[in-house]
A protein has these predicted regions:
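Hydrophobic alpha-helical targeting segments used for export or membrane insertion
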Residues: 17-22, 95
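Bacterial N-terminal signal peptides that target proteins for export
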Residues: 3-17
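N-terminal, post-cleavage mature segments of outer-membrane
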Residues: 14, 30-32
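Short linear, low-complexity motifs centered on an aromatic residue
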Residues: 1-3, 27
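C-terminal segment of classical bacterial N-terminal signal peptides
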Residues: 22-30
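N-terminal targeting pre-sequences for secretion and organelle import
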Residues: 152, 157-176
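Gly/Pro-biased beta-strand-loop elements
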Residues: 33-137, 161-164
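C-terminal/domain-terminus segments
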Residues: 140-154
């Protein structure tokens, strides 16, 4: 990993072989992943999503976190609370949930992992509530917006980076 320093922010330039192997059907999007000061009470390894900021923070300790840009739930589809990462999946298949099927009745019953129309992207961290995940995307232009049905979307190279850093059992806190 190479690190570039400016004032008090470090930018990561990481040549992830994993990410290159995982990204299905497309070029990498520019990521704004960076290490930033973080003043919340959270153990290292905790994931904090600040919905209003549209950022995910991975707490690394010493008053710092890695900040990733994300897409979050659109109005009426957001959730707040605490869950745990209960699974890690590479190039997961996607079964559209009922509320998504209701709005998009022509969706197939399952979209295979790695397919260009699979919204899960390169990897997914499933959450203990069973309904949501932190995952990649096939719509990188949605990052930084309120776009999902409640899941947390990341650039594929960012979710690959997070996948490598986070363990099953990690705490996930989603706040306004």
């Amino acid at each position: 990993m190479s690190t570039y320093r400016t004032t008090n922010v470090r930018f990561f330039g990481k040549g992830l072989v994993l990410a290159a192997a995982l990204v299905a059907g497309g070029a990498f999007q520019a990521s704004a992943r960076e290490v930033v000061p973080f003043k919340a009470v959270a153990e290292p390894g905790t994931i904090v999503v600040r919905t209003s900021e549209r950022h995910l923070y991975l707490v690394v300790g010493n008053g710092e976190a890695i900040r990733y840009p994300v897409a979050v739930g659109k109005p009426g589809k957001q959730w707040f609370g605490s869950e745990m990462v209960d699974g890690k999946h590479l190039r997961p298949a996607w079964v559209p949930p009922e509320d998504v099927k209701k709005d998009n009745p022509n969706l197939p019953e399952i979209i295979q992992g790695g397919a260009p129309n699979n919204p899960m992207g390169a990897a997914a961290l499933t959450l203990s509530g069973g309904k949501y995940a932190i995952h990649g995307t096939n719509r990188p232009e949605s990052i930084g917006t309120f776009a999902s049905y409640g899941c947390i979307r990341m650039h594929n190279e960012d979710v690959a980076d997070l996948y490598e850093r986070v363990s099953v059992g990690a705490r996930v806190v989603v706040s306004k």
